[in-house]
Amino acid sequence: VFGAGIAIGVYFENSRSSSIQDLYYDYEITVSDVSASLDILSSSNLSCTETWNNLLTLNDNVYNTAVKLEKYDASNKITDELIVLHKRYDLLRTILWQQFILAKNKCGEQRNTIVYLYQYKDPSINTRGFQTAMSNYLTDLDNKYPDKIVLIPIAADLNVISLDLMTKLYGVKGYPVVVVNEKYKFENLSSLSSIESYLKLNIENSKTNSRSF
């Protein structure tokens, strides 16, 4: 029985190591794709529509790959190895956030950026519950307005220097928080419904402005 227990333990440890290795492989492919794509975007004369479409595709690819990591997080103890891997994905998302800002400055606000900054390491029980509610609300919002918003979730407590600089630039002082269009911050459950109210107003204003040309 003791020998069988050791064998089972070794099997699960090997399986865990293999899963993490697969996540690293996925990350390496994703970061290479993002890097090459951004180089092409910066050196080409793509139209604004093409630029936005490419950035949206990259954001979707990063999100879909990171979902695997989130599922692994949910079923395993958070280790230093997982934190490092998560930090790499959060850096990618920060880079994409920067690129969306550049695209808006160049081409206009074709989408509303909704950046969800949350606690990853050791959130309290209350914070964990709050973040679950916030995440569910934003997911529903993303499904309701799929062609109007860009949702970018980023763990904000992993010491990503570029992210820390951006949060200081936009006056973010605590987490979790939702930053909409780099202008408005929503920090509690009672303010979440205001996000949709703002989006509706902004979408309507965009329609009015487009009709005036």
Language-model regions, residue ranges each:
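Soluble periplasmic/extracytoplasmic beta-strand elements of cell-envelope proteins
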Residues: 113-117, 177-179
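Short acidic, S/G/P-rich loop/turn micro-motifs used as interaction or catalytic elements
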Residues: 121-125, 159, 184-186
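Thiol-based oxidoreductase modules, predominantly thioredoxin-like and allied folds used
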Residues: 116-120, 146-161
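Solvent-exposed, polar/charged alpha-helical surfaces in well-ordered, non-transmembrane soluble domains
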Residues: 136-140, 193, 197, 201
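A short, hydrophobic beta-strand/beta-hairpin element that forms part of a small beta-sheet core
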Residues: 173-188
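Non-globular targeting/processing and membrane-anchoring segments
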Residues: 1-113, 123, 127-130, 139, ...
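C-terminal regions of proteins
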Residues: 164-170
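Loop/turn elements at helix/coil->beta-strand transitions in domains of secreted/extracellular proteins
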Residues: 111-112, 146-150, 174-175
